[in-house]
A protein has these predicted regions:
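Long, small/polar-residue-biased beta-strand-and-loop interaction regions
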Residues: 1-178
Length: 178
């Protein structure tokens, strides 16, 4: 007598390792504008949120000693006017890279063809631009992530100068929404 026996079976096993945690970072950027300045140094002493609907920045006329004047700004060839200083702060836990673009112009936008803008970031001069050339006045600026209670920030100064070659066709014109 012959006896044959077989067993047919599938064996499975699982091995796994748990990943502790995957968590995304938080990007938290604030944009503020200067509202008050030290009368001796001219440095900003107070800031307001620039992202609020009622926050509209206006160019500021300064005298020869860089003192701010409250008069209306009427552009004329050769004159330079400044925006209030802007402060970009990184309150998040991710590093940040940003640029500042001049855009949104409405009205007689050809007026921007004869205004050259320039900027500085923390005192370092950036490239001067004309809006018709693309409008990115500040590019590739980096801010580290917030560490403890200290939020890294940059102070940006932007000015515009009307070209001395601007002719009569630019008189009594308005551009808004920049």
């Amino acid at each position: 007598t012959m006896l044959v026996g077989t067993t047919f079976a599938w064996f499975t096993d699982t091995a796994s390792a748990k990943v502790n945690q995957i968590k995304s970072g938080k990007l938290d950027v604030t944009l503020e504008y200067a509202t008050a300045w030290d009368t001796t140094t001219g440095e900003p002493t107070a800031w307001a949120d620039a992202t609020q609907p009622e926050s509209m920045l206006s160019f500021i006329r300064t005298d020869a000693n860089n003192n701010k004047q409250a008069t209306d700004v009427l552009w004329e060839p050769g004159c330079t006017y400044n925006l209030p200083e802007l402060r970009v702060s990184n309150n998040g836990n991710l590093s940040l890279k940003y640029k500042v673009v001049i855009s949104g112009a409405e009205g007689y936008t050809k007026l921007l063809d004869v205004i050259d803008f320039k900027a500085s970031v923390d005192g370092a001069e950036q490239r001067a631009v004309n809006v018709k050339d693309g409008g990115a006045i500040v590019t590739d600026v980096k801010l580290a992530a917030k560490s403890g209670d200290n939020a890294p920030s940059n102070v940006i100064k932007i000015s515009g100068t009307m070209q001395t070659t601007a002719g009569n066709e630019y008189q009594n014109r308005t551009v808004t929404g920049i």
